[in-house]
Design a protein with these regions (language model features):
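Short, hydrophobic alpha-helical segments
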Residues: 14, 114-117
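Small-molecule kinase domains that catalyze NTP-dependent phosphoryl transfer to phosphate-bearing small molecules
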Residues: 59-104
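Conserved phosphate-donor/acceptor-positioning beta-strand/loop module used by diverse small-molecule
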Residues: 32-55, 59-68
Length: 117
């Protein structure tokens, strides 16, 4: 399946290089890699809508519905392939609420974690 093909590529890349992998159940795929940092970033729907419209220039019509559907698909995919719960803090080394912290601060924190680990 596509999941297993992606998993093999993720493992291969991670075993050879320093990398950042967004999504793809990478925290689960790389759980046996000791030098991996697993992070979950989340925000409320209002912030997601604002970012989608401002940053990605998406049309604001139906964007809330689209974003909720995407999150639901992500959740189903993650839960199915990992047997874990998407967004459950126990599955990650750190979780950040980008509404509270701000996305640029989240990036700075992650960078500091990676450098000092």
């Amino acid at each position: 399946t596509m999941f297993f093909a992606q998993s093999n590529v993720i493992k291969e890349v991670a075993s050879k290089h320093s990398c950042v992998i967004v999504g793809r159940c990478a925290n689960h795929v790389l759980e046996k890699f000791d030098d991996c940092i697993n992070i979950f970033i989340y925000s409320n729907i209002e912030s997601k809508i604002k970012r989608a419209v401002e940053e990605y220039k998406l049309d604001s019509n139906n964007i809330e519905k689209i974003l909720k559907e995407r999150d639901k698909l992500r959740e189903k995919h993650y839960n199915y392939y990992t047997g874990k719960v998407w967004g459950d803090a126990r599955n990650y080394h750190a979780c950040f609420n980008s509404d509270f912290i701000g996305i640029n601060n989240v990036v700075d924190i992650i960078e500091k974690i990676a450098i000092n680990r």
